[in-house]
From Swiss-Prot:
Keywords for this protein: Cytoplasm, Endonuclease, Hydrolase, Metal-binding, Nuclease, Ribosome biogenesis, rRNA processing, Zinc
Gene3D superfamilies: Metalloproteases ('zincins'), catalytic domain (3.40.390.30)
Chain positions recorded as Zn(2+) binding sites: 117, 121, 127
Cellular component per GO, a single term: cytoplasm
Presence of keyword Cytoplasm: yes
Annotated protein name in UniProt: Endoribonuclease YbeY
HAMAP family, sorted: Endoribonucl_YbeY (MF_00009)
GO terms, biological process: rRNA processing
Gene source species: Shewanella halifaxensis (strain HAW-EB4)
Gene (UniProt): ybeY
């Protein structure tokens, strides 16, 4: 499947003000890149939030009482039902900005990385153990570099 054939229905929710955010077109490109060769169509929500909402969701769903860069909530259809609904990503603008500065990375490249990373989680990838982490990071690096950005795991 050619990634240009992937149809994306992206519901973008912006629940934060005062940050430089990527455009809907950029977000859609990054989602299409992450879904390359996996789905012909996909529906997902990306919600960009503040520190408080990120921390509340991270505490509720992961037991970690701090904000985080991206949370992924995959949609699980009942058995036998095929739907293009992928799930939801919640991205904290303040954390992404701070991480980009701390890691000396261009903000736009870090946004791309967070969207690709979150989409891979929606597809079932994880980084709980070393072998899973290695597989996921390798795929992330390939996808991010295909977008023209540098390896997100390379020290700056």
């Amino acid at each position: 499947m050619n990634d240009n054939q992937t149809v994306i229905d992206l519901d973008l929710q912006i629940a934060v003000e005062g940050f430089e955010l990527p455009s809907q077109a950029e977000l859609e490109l990054w989602v299409k890149t992450a879904l390359r060769d996996t789905m012909s169509e996909a529906e997902l929500t990306i919600r960009i939030v503040d520190v408080e909402e990120s921390q509340e969701l991270n505490s509720t769903y992961r037991g970690k009482d701090k904000p985080t860069n991206v949370l992924s909530f995959p949609f699980e259809a009942p058995p036998g039902i095929e739907l293009p609904l992928l799930g939801d990503l919640v991205i904290c603008a303040a954390v992404v900005k701070q991480e980009a500065m701390d890691q000396n990375k261009p903000l736009i490249a870090h946004w791309a990385h967070m969207v690709v990373h979150g989409c891979l989680h929606l597809l079932g990838y994880d980084h709980i153990d070393d072998s899973e982490a290695e597989e996921m990071e390798s795929l992330e690096t390939h996808l991010i570099e295909s977008l023209g950005y540098i390896n997100p795991y390379k020290e700056q």
